[in-house]
Amino acid sequence: MIVARAHHIGTTGGEERGMEVGVGLPTTTPGADGRCLLEWARRAEEGPFASLGVLDRMLYRSVEPFAALSAAAAVTTRVRLVTMVVIGPLRNTVLLAKQAASLDLLSGGRLTLGLAIGARADDYQALGVDQAGRGRRLGEQLAELRSIWEKAEVGPEPVQPGGPPLLAGGMSGEAFARMARSADGYVHGGGPPRAFAGAAAKAWAAWRDLERPGRPQLWGQGYFALGDADPGSAYLRDYYAFTGPFASRIAAGNLTSGRAVKDFVRGYQEAGCDQLVLLPTVSDPAQLDRLADVLA
């Protein structure tokens, strides 16, 4: 089984380790209601998946990520819950710390908090937040979150000592430096394995530049809709419409066959990924069974 931590020599870190595969909740896809999200969470818990991930978007027909993961926490006990990613600078840091600590408590210590700055100007405008300086603000947030949790200034106290693991995303030099300074690992925004490999190498380099002990967690993501290519790709073109023509390139990366999924997973394994979260582009819970069969 691909998800069962098949060991390999990581190309970015030079050490032997395995990769787990998680799955996303369809919080942004058409047709997903509360019942659908709970069914996804239950099936993921029963299947071979290591985590449940969610996206974050303000001006879209999407479910708020902490609400979605709280619902998932209520019907699961095993899978890790991860934000892929929450747009940190859109949120008050104290409130964000409380939301994350609350979810960590409710889930029994299963939250991994991925944060990034986002690229959609309309989300910032909707909340009256200045997009300028958002990278600096995220860097401050990463440090402040740890301080808030460690000092127990805002309850509840997280189950995980020091708070949930923090992942930071982004592709600029400062984004990698920010990750190495204040996070526990790096979360990649998606794309083919070669793109992840390049980003992972930069994450490792930033980590080593600061002479941090241990190693960064490396998380990746991709999109899939097995047997449902047309609606899945249409969703991606809509979701990424703000990127213009690039949206069609993203849609072309939708994994719609078993062979495509296997090749994608293998590529991320070889690139040194620790956990790959496959995000659905259609909301049918039967997708989980199809994906589990492919990964078996």
Regions found by a protein language model. Give the residues of each.
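Active-site-adjacent structural elements that line small-molecule/cofactor binding pockets in enzymes
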Residues: 1-296
